[in-house]
């Protein structure tokens, strides 16, 4: 494929006002970065040249690439000085890396769960690289529109969480079991249950955990630290949660009541175990010995 003309990131970028950007939550900002990231990658795959400009150098160094109240442009030259006068706009540029052939490749990819339809051609845009082709084919920046809600890509990324409405707020899905999460952090943590990965290891006994908080809790068993003490009986606990649960035994509180049997429990774990009995759900079992437990915490 012969090399096509040079294009800039701004040719396919979506700009937001300062007010719009401030109203976007973390997941919307990440979605915006991922879409822009795939746009750059697809431009390269189509043969378009991405100039080795100042912003690319900044990207490779992993530096912060946006400031409030101005546009951070990819090419700073006299022809574009007027653009620097724009106020109250933000361009968020994704982090990309350089491979051995000096072409720009994407660090992460994103397949949008919504199918998009381009206004001019009616072509389906199932992911952002197809959106990029549409943007380059037609004149001007026409929006791609979601078939499910009729909102454009720009509106999808704006403060109202249209994409999360389609996916019931869970936009991060496991490709092994299809379980979905609202946050990529929770998805990564869940995937460890498939891989068996336990990155947090105790330096004293070598026991490993999937979460840093579990490691810190375990380390207190070595030090004997029990910072949470009941003011009524003096019993101390490693976790504040265990203290609160213990205090209910003094108060006689039973906050969890089964709507089928009417049985009440002071702890949520007992309530969940009772619920398993009613719905006939198979309790979690040990993969090594086959022994079943009413609670997953007992299995661990």
UniProtKB/Swiss-Prot annotation:
A zinc finger (C2H2-type) spans 172-194, 200-222, 228-250, 256-278. InterPro entries: KRAB, KRAB_dom_sf, Znf_C2H2_sf, Znf_C2H2_type. The keyword Metal-binding applies. Its main location: nucleus. One of its GO terms (molecular function) is DNA-binding transcription factor activity, RNA polymerase II-specific. GO terms for cellular component: nucleus. This is Zinc finger protein 705B. It comes from Homo sapiens. The lineage of its organism: Eukaryota, Metazoa, Chordata, Craniata, Vertebrata. The gene is ZNF705B.
